[in-house]
Amino acid sequence: MPRVMFTISYSIKPESRDQYLALIVEMKNHLTTVGKHNYSVFESKGKKNQFTEVFVANSLEEYDTLEDNMDEKAQELTSTLQSFVDDGGMKYNTIVEAV
């Protein structure tokens, strides 16, 4: 079964950086412990305040349930995070393991 990688890339407002970093720590903890997701957050090298969230699902079926399995706390954290994103918005990408 091929794995699936789902990414969300965005830049945050510079004045929101400290709040964002505190929130993303809480979000990662919640999604990996409570939600049992394979989830990481990366900052682009050389591009301060540009981040990519990465979810790795072990199958297409698991990927299809990612959003359905977000509890109320995860939805609240995501909503707060969106307020830190700059006017460029979020860019989504889904890739499926080839081999």
Residue ranges: model-predicted function:
Residues M1-P2, V99:
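Absolute protein N-terminus
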Residues P2, T52, Q75, N93-T94:
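Residue-level marker of intrinsically disordered, low-complexity segments enriched
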Residues V4-Y10, S40-E67:
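Short, well-ordered beta-strand segments in beta-rich or mixed alpha/beta enzyme
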Residues S11-A22:
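Short, surface-exposed ligand-recognition loops at beta-strand->loop->(often short) alpha-helix junctions
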Residues K13-E15, N58-L60, A98-V99:
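Generic structural motif
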Residues H30-Y39, V56-K91:
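An amphipathic, aromatic/His-enriched active-site/gating alpha helix that lines ligand/cofactor pockets
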Residues K91-V99:
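Short, low-order "capping/linker" segments at domain edges
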